[in-house]
C-alpha cells in the first residue's frame, strides 16, 4: 500500500493545532521534527549528523493511506490550515506532499546483512543464512533483531579485531553493554574460559542469551551494571558504548581487572579520544594503544 506523506513547516506555537488537524484527517497520529530538542541534547550525544535548525520552527508530518479519498482529505487539510492561520497562532507554510511505499521494516534490513569477515578469523554471519566456514574461520551467527546493529559497524569491528589478539585460552572476560552479545560470543569462540556479559536493557539481555544459544557457547548474561560484578577477577574488560559512559565506569573497571589486565574501550568518536585517554590515566589505567576506523576510536589500557 502507498501512503501520501504530508509535511507542514510551521512556527512552534501553531504545531499543536497542525498536529491535531493531521490526527483528525489520518486517524493515525503525527510526527514532529523539532530542532530545539536536537539543540538541547546535542552536548549529551557523542555525535549527530543533524544540522542546527531554527528553534522557532518545527515540521509536522502525517500519512494518508491511498485507499482512502485522498483528494477530499487534501481539500479538508487546506481548509483546516487556513483556519489555523486565521487564529494568528504563528506562521504555517503550505503543505508538501509525496507518495511513499509501505515497507516491511521488520525484515527489509535483512537484505543488506551478509556474511562479513571482520578480523583474521572472525566472520559475522546472519543467523538465517547457510554458511560453510573455511579452515580457521570462527563464524558468529547473529540475529540482531530491530534493536541492535549487525556487528559490522566500525566500533564493533575494531573490538573484534583486537579481541583476536587479546583473548587467551582460559581467560576471564567481561563485556559491558553487551547488546546483541556479539563481542561476548567472539571472546568465547577465541578461547575465553568464562565470559560475563552485562547490560542494563532487558531486551539486550534476552538477545544476548539467544545469540549465545545460536552459537553453542555458554555465557553468563546478566541484567546488571559493572559495579554489581565481583572485583579483581577479569583478565579483559571490553566496553563498546559511548565516551561519557566509558569515563563514568573507569573506577569500576580498574577495581575489576587483575594486575596486568586489559581494558578495551570502543564507541568513542575521534574528537573524544584525548578526553577518554586522560580519564583512563586518572583512574590508574595505562593507555597502551589506540586504533581508528571511520572516525571512531578504540583505546586499549592496562592495569599496572
Swiss-Prot record:
Name of the protein this chain belongs to: Ribosomal protein L11 methyltransferase
Top-level division of the source organism's lineage: Bacteria
SUPFAM superfamilies found in the cross-reference section: S-adenosyl-L-methionine-dependent methyltransferases
Subcellular location(s) of the protein: Cytoplasm
InterPro entries: Ribosomal_L11_MeTrfase_PrmA (IPR050078), Ribosomal_PrmA_MeTrfase (IPR004498), SAM-dependent_MTases_sf (IPR029063)
UniProt cross-references to HAMAP family, sorted A to Z: Methyltr_PrmA (MF_00735)
Pfam families membership: PrmA
GO biological process: methylation
EC number of the protein: 2.1.1.-
Reaction equations catalysed: L-lysyl-[protein] + 3 S-adenosyl-L-methionine = N(6),N(6),N(6)-trimethyl-L-lysyl-[protein] + 3 S-adenosyl-L-homocysteine + 3 H(+)
Family note: Belongs to the methyltransferase superfamily. PrmA family.
Top EC group: transferase
Source organism per UniProt: Symbiobacterium thermophilum (strain DSM 24528 / JCM 14929 / IAM 14863 / T)
Transmembrane helix keyword on record: no
Molecular-function annotations in GO: protein-lysine N-methyltransferase activity
Record: residues binding S-adenosyl-L-methionine: 156, 177, 199, 240
Role summary: Methylates ribosomal protein L11.
GO CC entries: cytoplasm
Alphabetical UniProt keywords: Cytoplasm, Methyltransferase, S-adenosyl-L-methionine, Transferase
Chief location: cytoplasm
Record field: transmembrane: none
Amino acid at each position: 500500500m502507498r501512503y501520501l506523506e504530508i509535511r507542514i513547516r510551521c512556527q512552534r506555537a501553531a504545531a499543536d493545532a497542525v498536529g491535531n488537524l493531521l490526527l483528525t484527517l489520518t486517524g493515525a497520529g503525527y510526527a514532529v521534527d523539532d530542532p530545539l530538542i536536537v539543540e538541547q541534547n546535542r552536548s549529551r550525544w557523542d555525535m549527530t549528523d543533524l544540522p542546527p535548525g531554527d528553534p522557532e520552527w518545527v515540521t509536522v508530518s502525517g500519512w494518508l493511506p491511498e485507499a482512502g479519498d485522498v483528494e477530499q482529505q487534501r481539500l479538508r487539510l487546506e481548509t483546516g490550515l487556513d483556519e489555523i492561520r486565521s487564529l494568528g497562532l504563528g506562521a504555517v507554510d503550505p503543505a508538501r506532499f509525496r507518495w511513499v511505499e509501505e515497507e516491511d521494516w521488520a525484515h527489509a534490513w535483512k537484505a543488506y546483512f551478509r556474511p562479513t569477515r571482520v578480523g583474521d578469523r572472525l566472520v559475522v554471519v546472519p543467523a538465517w543464512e547457510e554458511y560453510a566456514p573455511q579452515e580457521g574461520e570462527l563464524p558468529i551467527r547473529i540475529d540482531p533483531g530491530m534493536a541492535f546493529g549487525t556487528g559490522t559497524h566500525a566500533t564493533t569491528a575494531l573490538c573484534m579485531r583486537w579481541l583476536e589478539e587479546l583473548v587467551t585460552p582460559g581467560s576471564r572476560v567481561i563485556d559491558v553493554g553487551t547488546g546483541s552479545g556479539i563481542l561476548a560470543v567472539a571472546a568465547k569462540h577465541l578461547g575465553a574460559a568464562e565470559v560475563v556479559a552485562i547490560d542494563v536493557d532487558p531486551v539486550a539481555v534476552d538477545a544476548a542469551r539467544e545469540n549465545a544459544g545460536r552459537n553453542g557457547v555458554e555465557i553468563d548474561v546478566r541484567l546488571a551494571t559493572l559495579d554489581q560484578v565481583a572485583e579483581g577477577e577479569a583478565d579483559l574488560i571490553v566496553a563498546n558504548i559511548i565516551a561519557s559512559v566509558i569515563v563514568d565506569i573507569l573506577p569500576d573497571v580498574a577495581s575489576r581487572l587483575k594486575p596486568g589486565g586489559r581494558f578495551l574501550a570502543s564507541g568513542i568518536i575521534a574528537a573524544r579520544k584525548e578526553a577518554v585517554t586522560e580519564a583512563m590515566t586518572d583512574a590508574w589505567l595505562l593507555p597502551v594503544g589506540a586504533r581508528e576506523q571511520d572516525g571512531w576510536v578504540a583505546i586499549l589500557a592496562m592495569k599496572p
